[in-house]
């Protein structure tokens, strides 16, 4: 786009190509992610991700910004993977890398521009607060996240302390992919109040309805898994609500195909 010398506003459409979703391919899993090359050759995943990261850093990142140290940016990406599902705290990210907060702000912008992360802001009735409060950060592709965190088998994933956060990111990415593929505006939020009530995701559906989503990496789901979404639903007065619990079954994405159906109704 840097080579375009005249404005294309109103004359061109920009398409955002993300990794494949579970709707587009049943081979997409939490461990593999959704890059087509990985789905076609799963045994070569580590080698492919290594090559992908090298190409991404040396071509995409360097093309966007004159970063002095690509090695530092690579460590930053790994640090983001370890903080997936957490509130974005730029100061905490800057300290271990020995860089400034403005540098972290720039690097976050690069990751967002290149589609590597999904930023999920908090939900407030006041729209202005959504723009001010810090978002949660997730990697767009769970397979890349697993690679960065050294998770290369389903057994390692099930035992990893990052499994819940990675699964939340997987769900967030599926929602965003669906919205993008349907040509809709990206609208995805999380909820947390001062009393400690927290709901993983809120998706506006039209002007009058909110879909409340809880994502759990547990293989077995009990009724209390819906406690948070039901509690929030009871407190919402000016919107209709629907509650969805997405769980991590033996097959990593067994329940995921039902999520898009829930959002489309």
Residue ranges and their predicted role:
Residues 180-181, 231-239:
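Arginine/glycine-rich "motif VI" loop of SF2 helicases in the C-terminal RecA-like domain
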Residues 211-220:
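Active-site ExK catalytic segment of metal-dependent nucleases
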Residues 1-3, 23-24, 147, 222-224, ...:
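Switch/connector loops and helix/strand junctions flanking conserved nucleotide-binding motifs
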Residues 13-23, 42:
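Conserved AAA+ ATPase "SRH/arginine-finger" region at the nucleotide-binding site
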Residues 248-265:
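Domain-level recognition of nuclease-like catalytic cores that cleave nucleotide substrates
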Residues 219-229:
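Active-site-adjacent loop/helix micro-motif of nuclease/hydrolase catalytic cores
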Residues 43, 47-210:
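Accessory nucleic acid-recognition modules appended to NTPase machines
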Residues 1-14:
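Short regulatory helix/loop adjacent to the ATP-binding pocket of P-loop NTPases
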